[in-house]
């Protein structure tokens, strides 16, 4: 570094602390860059300090006359040192000693001064380090508290001077990371040549002139006198007010300053040994926080490298950075405090590797200790083992068998010691010989009875022990042929089951080593493999225990083989990708791909590299699918391993349930980790995540994350990551890289999965810190320095991780595992012992860190199992240190655990505690409630059931205890109280408060819901009880509204999603409480639990406007999904009948509430609020799909609304079409595209049913409307909706019963009769369509929809016959159409031209029917749709296209020219050109035009079946060969925020008049007072809802028994939706207020931060704070988890939620032709679609998409199962590109289906507001 040799004045200023009493003061000097300090001078009073200063600043003011000044400096050469170095002391005397010179030049960026002065004028001389040349990659984490305290410049760039408050008011709370300011290059001021100065300093003239400017340059470091008067002291009181203390309530403890100074004197330069006094730490925290409020542009005293690294760091953003600790904390949000990319995992300390055996661990421990360290236990064991081996060289009698039984206990310590000490002696070989002899049946037969069995059992146990010796032991056993010997024993006659179980245990331990497994699976030519022999054994007649034990071994073999196959595929991918440049080997590959995340790379380069990779990678789609399945299987096997892979205890019996029995079996995971390790699993996963082709595949990505998440849930899994630390570092980089990519692309991906990368990183880092703590305790003795710098560094890192919610949950999770919390408790106990005799502990920074971290764990971790072992010691610590605020708060959290054992009999005490504290819910006093509920969950709620698991009946006992302790009533009251607290802030759109407030709310809600779910499931499962306490559904509906309606981010995060799932599950338990054995009457139906629950939910929807949306979501979540289910395998008839019966039961119970349902449809039908429109459509479709009565009920209601609307105008006037008509028709249109709704409409408009004649009339009115569209916009809209409805009605694929190929043409006619309008209607519809074509006023969209509809009809004789009849009546229609196409042709209207020509080709002849415009080839049509027999010939078509003025040929010629002209710019028009030329030639060669023949025979359709029959025989599932993303997608399109209609109806309203009329008795003043100033009352038992005579009754009042319990109602979800894959769960996409565009806009990150609209709202209403006085910070971005499936068959239900992002859906391939075909699965109108944005303008969004597309091949099936047929027919798109009135560029981009939702890819619609 270049150092300027001239000495300059670096700093000159006066620090004042006016105070009555004299005390020690601390001040800090900061430099904007690194300086070299040569000299420090204290300027005595009255002496001029510098000639270049104005008089008011030029003179010294130091007082008193003498004092000692201690100086400390920040050593920039030790950037991560947690403390300041000591510079030295000056014994100041104004007459003799004013100059201090350090022993050597010191380079630093700051000084700390401490001394007993009231006023100090200080000059610092030295030189500036001109070059900053550090280029470290990663900055050190901010250091933990330094000993010398250091106030800093605050808000107004002034250093507040401390006043005379006693400084011993500080307590060592950990510091907060400081905000960094920009660095400025230094420009040092010159020194002044004052006559007082004994040294003459070089001064140059030009520098002298520079004085003012340069003095200014350093000015910010000293107090700025102009901005703030000198009196703005840096006082202790000030600090207490300004400083956001850690968690808000740190008590300040006494500090003995003198003692601390003495110690400082003793040890001037040792960083570590200066006791880290509380005050410094607390002060620093204060300064940092104040700095956060107003940074002066310079960073805190710290290493100069940090600034550089900060700039590099800014590219990384946490997905949701909310640092919300306590009220004061909000003032100081730390910047990038803890860069996770900065820290990598290091080799594992303290803990042992999870896949090593006890023997291997013992050997490595002995090696580490060294051979000289005596280990008495090992020596004794080795001596005894040697004696036994020597004693019985030959003897094989009873004593030898006894020796065999003793040996296993000596192997771990004894054999390990022998192998290390005495390498010559082959003890292992001798033991293997003995083992083989012990297992030898011949030797056993020679033993007396009983001894022979003992010998064989001892032999098997010895195998198990020797297999534990790792590779050497297993290798020797295998060479001795142990597998064959064990099989001999298993296959031998008359061997008891218990002996076979022992043999299996031995075999299991052999294959638990990879060498053993390899040998077991290997077969030679002349003998079978162990696997084959084991299968043969199981297939013999064996007892159930033996089969169970054998199956466990088979499962292990399967797992091993799956891993081998994954490794093979991974190696294959690695080889293939290495062909790409820079990808020569897997590791390089990983790095190269990770590198590419660097924004410096050009996008083109990235794209081309990816393409290279894709092209060169020969991994097929099939192999990727296989890889996905293998990874999913790995996850499944690991999840079920404890129940399927362990050897059963000898004394247990595999029953379905158990009450008591042996404790849980062995732990299977070490073996699985060994297999994973030997197959380099983490390296393979990293490779998969680093290669575009696999990392972009949702299946692979999701399956990988599932496995990694599962591993990270347990201590052993995390240790596995740590033991493979190099692979884990790369893996986390790869995961974070994927997340970063999505951030760059603006993808709205699933928050939970994004956060998973960070969560995994934080979890492993936390565990690493814990290992460092434990190993520190191992190394250090009690006498060593307590606040060791390493220890503080570790604790500080842990503390920094807790600053973001993901990190906080990770810390809580890891500390709650195993005995990890002991690391903090050890620290706290050590200091509290010290505290007995002295005050060190209260000053110890480490102690305070430990207290804070323990408190964070208690608050955020729901894993309370660890509290069982630690609660007593923690409570003791809290009692011991009553001055520590953190510990006192912890004491409140742990209050319910006093003298508590986590057993079933603690339930009454805990419930009693909850009852007593219910009024303190969500207050500081009531935090123990959360813990009590968590413990209750732990004790009383069974874990989710896993396949193969025995049911433990202790959970039933726990539920009985809950009921007897009045648990039901208590939990309902908890929910009611929680609702009353949350309602007010929610109404004002205040979020949930700080992190702590939010964690508490979520935790309390989840625990209470879990407990209620457990109790109700157990109670209602058999149908023998009814539960009529309607407080439960009522409280749940409110809770759902408060926590799960619409978050600001537009989607639920994982916690909210789980709460929603729990609420749905609890409400669904009410459907179980129906006893099928009882006779069902209207009365019993209306009063059973199911109906009462439904009534509560339905009535809540319309109760208050704030509950509209939430109520609709809730209802949609409860209803079954529409059929058919999509699946890859045939569903059993029994399951199908369950699915249909469930829907009938729902229909019956809903029919009782018909009035409510009609009211809901009527109320919302006219809404302009799009999310509510969307939800209403969704619910109507679900209701119609249940059964015919509900379908008719809903469709009647909708049609009645249309009838009322159209008939409301008086007779003589022309009908007025309003926007309300438009909305009603839009609703009908959306519903008509769904099978059940369409058939109900057809049923009603036929007019055959008495009383429904009005619907037939209104249908005719609608047809008349289409014929005369008129020119008003509203009327045009209505016409377009009606044509779209006609299209749905004429589509024979929208049908309940899908045709099966095996049933032939007869079934085709039936299909048509059941899915198309009757003859009379069809005639009217065809006439209407042709009249529309002939009408010159028809809009472009109408024409396109009509042509498409005619194409549907032309597919079969029935439709074509009616079309021909209409063409005879309206012969000019096709000519008008062609003329219109030619006259308006442009690139944008190409779609209409293409469709029209396709239609003409289609009707020309039967064999050309399959031809499509985009490929102009003939297509064979197979299966369900028989060839059409009827057609037109070319001459007839020519006649139809002719007019007096011009011939068809001339029109085609003109069209050809136009297309040719446009196709130069647009290649996509080429196929249209071919079409035009082909038709022109056909017509030219056809000869003279002929009139249409009327010889056709009218096809007669059979009478349609009744609606009820159609529902009974409907297709229940659709088969697909691959469960692709389209099938996995949610059944309904997510609502898109982009579809907001800007022309919403505006209605004039006089609000004052309205309020006087409706709310005359409303007292606004008192209401506001009640809302803002009063506490919500507790829902005690005295306040009951009207209608419930609760009084003092318990919940039993509402439980009645019908005495029969055999029947178990299958009324759960009877539909299967596989667990969705993919990253998104997605959002309704809009904020709380649906049409508030400002709210929907994300904050713009491309400009300096401005306030978001919700921040303004929050600012206006900031008096409203959550109950414990914590002001709401900025709402964190949400994290979320993938939704679990909602299938009834899988037994696993998740919510599908109303918030789904686009990426659930498979994006259909772009159309090759001029317009897309109908994409998706034929016959399934639930497949959704994503079309690229930007090509078209669609304003009628939010409805279901049901485009169809290329279809999988057929298979013969029963009538209930349907496999789609490949009819790539003519264009099947739905309607136009959106109504013409809304579309500026109608026609561009091709029709993308009927209701195209905006947004392509995953949730990219966000961009419309941000870019």
Curated annotation (Swiss-Prot):
Comp. bias intervals (Basic and acidic residues): 160-169
Lineage, top ranks: Eukaryota, Metazoa, Chordata, Craniata, Vertebrata
Origin: domain of life: Eukaryota
Name under which the protein is recorded: Protein virilizer homolog
Biased composition annotated in UniProt, kind: Polar residues: 224-233, 1722-1747
Compositional bias ranges of the Basic residues kind: 1802-1811
One annotated Gene Ontology cellular component of this protein: cytoplasm
Phosphotyrosine carried by residues: 913
Species, as recorded: Mus musculus
Gene name per UniProt: Virma
Modified residues (Phosphoserine): 133, 138, 173, 222, 1578
Region of interest (Disordered), residue spans: 132-302, 1615-1634, 1662-1811
